């Protein structure tokens, strides 16, 4: 009996020594946690109402989310809410007062909209993400546009566009519009309208005075460059 116990203890001791001499194993890696899904933005009641209005009134020209696919029609997605509201208000004629901004199409489209409707539409488009326009590829023109955007043209008294619209074209929502990613054809048309005086709803005539100093080539260059900004 004693011999059997001694033998069993000897075997156990040998087993423990053998395990002690084995190299340590690295712990099994923990399962990688799945990345949390991106939170869906919560839209205000105004924006939700604006979505419904935009679907029936604006989508044909500007698309339901405001990302225009027609070069001459502006992209409204991501534009400043206050700026969109101002433009819609300017398109609408009041009693005994003509519209501050002229466009046969837009003047007619805003006619049935109330002030609250226009605020809601502005809230909807401002809440959307801009999908940038197809970038221009004329490197020489883009270089000229970049120079104007960043530094202006001192000899002609043209200030840098970035001074008001930002280095990346995001603008200042309550004052200056987003031009980064905007349709180049639309920006070009508006600068020419300011230059000709056909558009005159700019504060203190700032855009009219600047555009009046710009050549067609400069307008084209800066419009193409702005469309490429991200």
Predicted segments with their positions:
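Periodic glycine anchor positions in long extracellular repeat architectures
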Residues: 63-66, 78, 166, 181
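Extracellular/lumenal glycan-associated surfaces
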Residues: 79-82, 86-87, 177, 181-183
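Axial heme c-ligation environment in periplasmic c-type cytochrome domains
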Residues: 69-77, 91-135, 173-178, 196-229
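Electrostatic cytochrome c docking/interface patches
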Residues: 22-54, 67-72, 127-154
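The canonical Cys-X-X-Cys-His
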Residues: 58-64, 121, 158-167, 222
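N-terminal export/targeting leaders of redox proteins
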Residues: 1-44, 89, 228-230
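Sequence context surrounding c-type heme c attachment/ligation sites in exported
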Residues: 51-55, 59, 151-162, 174-189
